[in-house]
């Protein structure tokens, strides 16, 4: 089982330089854990691509369908008071935005407060650094401009 943040899920939905590596990683362990808002965050990134003309309406429909298939199989960590407390702490000790702190807090909750027992997959350097400092083994995906998968 691995925790995937939104930046790591995106290469599974759109073609990026890291898509093959991300797909190999998910094939090696299909047990995916994500934060509750991951699907929304990914849909937002896809909408930015469509608005920026990097995607056609057809590309968008294909990507959203792919995202929905992934979402039907993953396990989501839902919002809780404990998760919020962790996120508040994380924004104070790491240079994270609120959404990234929620991602990392969700991973900590998923790991039952034992980060060394859960891999954290991300394409976000700042989030990766914070995750390492919190004790996670991080799988870093380097990304370039996305294109339709």
Residue ranges of model-derived segments:
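Structured helix-beta-strand junction loops
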Residues: 28-29, 70-73, 134
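Active-site-proximal, substrate-binding regions of enzyme catalytic domains
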Residues: 37-93
């Amino acid at each position: 089982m691995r925790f995937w943040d939104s930046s790591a899920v995106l290469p599974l939905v759109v073609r990026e330089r890291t898509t093959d590596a991300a797909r190999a990683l998910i094939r090696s362990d299909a047990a995916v854990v994500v934060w509750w808002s991951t699907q929304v965050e990914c849909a937002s990134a896809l909408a930015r691509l469509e608005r920026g003309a990097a995607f056609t309406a057809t590309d968008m429909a294909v990507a959203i369908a792919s995202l929905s298939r992934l979402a039907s199989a993953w396990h989501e960590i839902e919002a809780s008071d404990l998760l919020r407390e962790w996120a508040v702490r994380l924004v104070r000790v790491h240079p994270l935005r609120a959404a990234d702190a929620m991602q990392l807090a969700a991973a900590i909750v998923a790991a039952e407060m034992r980060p060394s027992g859960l891999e954290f997959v991300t394409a976000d350097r700042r989030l990766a650094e914070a995750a390492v400092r919190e004790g996670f083994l991080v799988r870093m995906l380097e990304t370039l401009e996305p294109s339709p998968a």
